[in-house]
């Protein structure tokens, strides 16, 4: 499957509660979203897994890739299209060894050096740091 990175949605349950999440993700896909990343920092592994399963059904229905933030285990368990990691997570090369060539690997970077290293180590795409401050990224440039 050719991946379309045009409009990449990152979920945030601090902005949209869980009851609304599934409906909002489906609306986003119908509105042109081409990729969805499930990003949860404050829930249990079991809740994260259950949420991922629910979102996988929605994204699969529309043939939109589901990316799991930080959690390689959950990405593998739900057969997500890929995983997205940051600079303080397991090294890119190790994650790539775990997930293999058939899953996507995205990496958040904040410098040219980090970007070059991530690509060298096997990243399929890069997430470049926040430009404007948000509720979760107050130190944006």
Feature names for model-found ranges:
Residues 93:
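Active-site phosphate/pyrophosphate- and oxyanion-stabilizing loops and adjacent acidic/basic residues
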Residues 75, 132-138:
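A short acidic, helix-capping loop that chelates divalent metal ions and anchors anionic groups
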Residues 141:
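Active-site-adjacent C-terminal substructures of enzyme catalytic domains
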Residues 1-89, 97-124:
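Conserved N-terminal beta1-alpha1 strand-loop-helix module at the mouth
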